[in-house]
Amino acid sequence: MALERTLSIIKPDAVAKNVIGEIYSRFEKAGLKVVAAKYKQLSRREAEGFYAVHRERPFFNALVEFMISGPVMIQALEGENAVAAHRDLLGATNPKDAAPGTIRADFADSIDANAAHGSDSVENAANEVAYFFAATEVVSR
């Protein structure tokens, strides 16, 4: 088992449904601790920078528009195998394919408005956490 950190973003669709607390409860029940958090409205520049890896993909502009359409809740999570544990909680990217009881199955509307983002690797998690949080803002507990 490895203690890891991962980045999680509760997207505008889930924030609008007022389920932040419910999602946080799922993180904690799964052994993931919130070690940094911020509630904010992403700027276009922040969203484009964060999703730059997808810039050439056909869905890039729609993704950016969605991510700036309302506030998001951004958190760094820490725990044993946090990247995989968080992705298991999220479920499949397309909520139609997500297992019952996962965050996306319960709260997502579509593959585009899919409730949450989760880092896909330990390496990407480190970069993504650093994108939104200064080292002094991430505090283990």
Swiss-Prot record:
Superkingdom classification of source: Bacteria
Essential cofactor(s): Mg(2+)
Compartments, as annotated in UniProt: Cytoplasm
Binding annotation for ATP: K11, F59, R87, T93, R104, N114
CDD domains per UniProt: NDPk_I
InterPro entries xref list: NDK-like_dom, NDK-like_dom_sf, Nucleoside_diP_kinase, Nucleoside_diP_kinase_AS
Annotated catalysed reactions: a 2'-deoxyribonucleoside 5'-diphosphate + ATP = a 2'-deoxyribonucleoside 5'-triphosphate + ADP; a ribonucleoside 5'-diphosphate + ATP = a ribonucleoside 5'-triphosphate + ADP
Keywords: ATP-binding, Cytoplasm, Kinase, Magnesium, Metal-binding, Nucleotide metabolism, Nucleotide-binding, Phosphoprotein, Transferase
Keyword Nucleotide-binding appears in the UniProt entry: yes
Molecular function in Gene Ontology: ATP binding; metal ion binding; nucleoside diphosphate kinase activity
GO cellular component, one term: cytoplasm
EC number of this enzyme: 2.7.4.6
HAMAP family: NDP_kinase (MF_00451)
Role description: Major role in the synthesis of nucleoside triphosphates other than ATP. The ATP gamma phosphate is transferred to the NDP beta phosphate via a ping-pong mechanism, using a phosphorylated active-site intermediate.
NCBIfam families in the cross-refs: PRK00668.1
Family: Belongs to the NDK family.
Subunit composition and interactions: Homotetramer.
Protein's name according to its UniProt entry: Nucleoside diphosphate kinase
Organism: Xanthomonas campestris pv. campestris (strain ATCC 33913 / DSM 3586 / NCPPB 528 / LMG 568 / P 25)
